[in-house]
Amino acid sequence: MLVHHVRVNNIFDGVIPYTREWLLTKNFYIENKKILDKQRLGGYCIWKPYIILTAFESIQEGDVVVYMDCGDIPSTKLRKNVYDHMSRHDQYLIQQHPHNKNKHFTKRDCFYYMNCDEEKYWDAVQLEGGFMAWKRTERNVQILSEYLKCCTDERIVTDIPNQSGLDNFDGYVSHRHDQSIITNLQVKYDLSKVDGWLDNTGAGAFIKWNALYHKDGVEYSNGSKNWDENGVLK
């Protein structure tokens, strides 16, 4: 549905669906089989930076790759929103609600083994991992490569108990895997981000989150509203 929606509405210049079947043909899968065969998020989403770097191979310097979870649906207005932002910045990363502190959704080992175990990382607002845009630049290739390296370290990305001997923070809920990693990297490199939690003025106005997830047979979308005929939320 996502691929068809993007193509029919010409939201972006092209769309490439990446599947589990595609992943199984890659050396990346063989090298990281232990993590990728875990059921949780199809292998803790460690394929995400790999997919973005793979897509970089088919575009020119300065072009933009947009990653989007297959369960989300973009408004037709998203193209302009992303284009306007990326004309001034090299990344489009979506910040969650300000109450979602990184330390409550990141296990301690993720901070420790990324050399990010300090207050500015703990208290950062966590990013949304289901949508992001990256301009192909040499710096972004380096950052995404670091993202990928961290994602392939089971101490950092998986739910195994902390190996560092450090405890999780008070108020810890659960680990958010690749999302925790990209949040640490955003703070480390001061990457560009936008508000996503404001329905009408933030990125949340242009994306229907988890639109294809079903609960009790009924489609729902994390409370998102419907769009009007102009492609924006009512």
Feature map (PLM): residue ranges:
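Glycosyltransferase catalytic domains, chiefly GT-A lineage
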Residues: 1-234
